[in-house]
Amino acid sequence: MGFYLPVTKTLRRWKYFLVLFVSLSVLAWIATFSGETVKSGPALPASPQTLVQADVVKDRLDTPPPDRLTTPPQKVECPQESPLLQGAVKLSFESSLTLKDVEGRNKGVSEGEYEPSDCTARQSVAVLIPHRSRERHLLYLLNHLHPFLQRQQLHYAIYVIQQAGDATFNRAKLLNVGYLEALKDYSWDCFIFHDVDLVPENDHNVYVCDKQPKHLVVGRNATGYKLRYKGYFGGVTAMTRDQFHQVNGFSNTYWGWGGEDDDLRIRVELQKMTIVRPPADIARYTMVFHKRDSGNEINKDRMRLLGRTPLVWKKDGLNSCSYETVLLERQPLYVNVTVEIGKPQN
């Protein structure tokens, strides 16, 4: 019995060692078999889904955190008063000035249109200039008007409306045409009806529309910087789309010089609107001297036509403006619209 107990303990230990040895052998065999299987198996191509997932992971790793992302800043509205305004500026009318010179000074203008790059303009403005045989005056005006409007931080475009042929000049009808053509390009907020021979002297005379029709030429050098006469509403005026539609635009029947601006004033008054003006020390213009144009003689019939305005304004204006477009050309500094507008009725 004493001999039997030691033998039993010894056998039990060997039994444990045997179980442990067998277990380790099995694990070693499994590991060896798995490694050989992986090595000997053919390489399988990655699935498209695997590649996409890998790309997504790579993109996520390469993408900086949100606070490092560079997104373009949102444009804010331009200030009520532009910080670029200079006030009264000295005007020069160089005889050597060329169109290329003016284009070179206004690189930000494309096809007559400009928009501030650093803020959103408070109003979009179409400047309409009736024209015939006044190339030098137009050049001087463009040279000063483009930087003038840019300093005011406006979104604007300039339209030059040329009367084709040699019939008597009709400023008012050309302005109706300019208005209708400009609206084909953009839904402008404000329209500036601008004579080609008047150059603004002070950029605080801001070319935007008001709640009432606005007259911008309070004084000019030719009149000692005084209003030409009480009720004068010519030279340069500003009206919104709604205001201009409300009066049915200009009359189409004023051939030759004079009367059409007074007709527009009567239309404004008939609609119970009030003409507003900037301060006299700001609304100043230089009129570039010129002789009376051939084909733009004084309209001797203007007083008779003015007497009929209250009777005919509803059917004589934008709704009766007929014309034929001869040429529409988008030049660097302005949109040229050449039209045939007919002849005066005898």
Task: State where each predicted segment sits.
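Acidic, Ser/Thr-rich intrinsically disordered and amphipathic helical segments
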Residues: F17-V22, A126, H137-Y140, H144, ...
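Short N-terminal or domain-adjacent regulatory/targeting segments
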Residues: V89-D118
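C-terminal catalytic/acceptor-binding lobe
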Residues: G2-V7, R12-D62, P73, C78-L99, ...
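Conserved catalytic core of nucleotide-sugar-dependent glycosyltransferases
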Residues: K9-L11, D166, A172-L174, Y179-L183, ...
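Hydrophobic targeting segments
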Residues: Q123-P130, L145, A157-V160, G178
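Active-site beta-to-alpha loop of glycosyltransferases that engages the nucleotide-sugar donor
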Residues: V76, S117-R122, I129-Y140, A164-D166
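Residue-level recognition of beta-strand->loop/alpha-helix junctions
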Residues: E111, V160-Q162, P279
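Short, well-formed alpha-helical segments that are part of the catalytic scaffolds
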Residues: R105-Y114, R134-L149
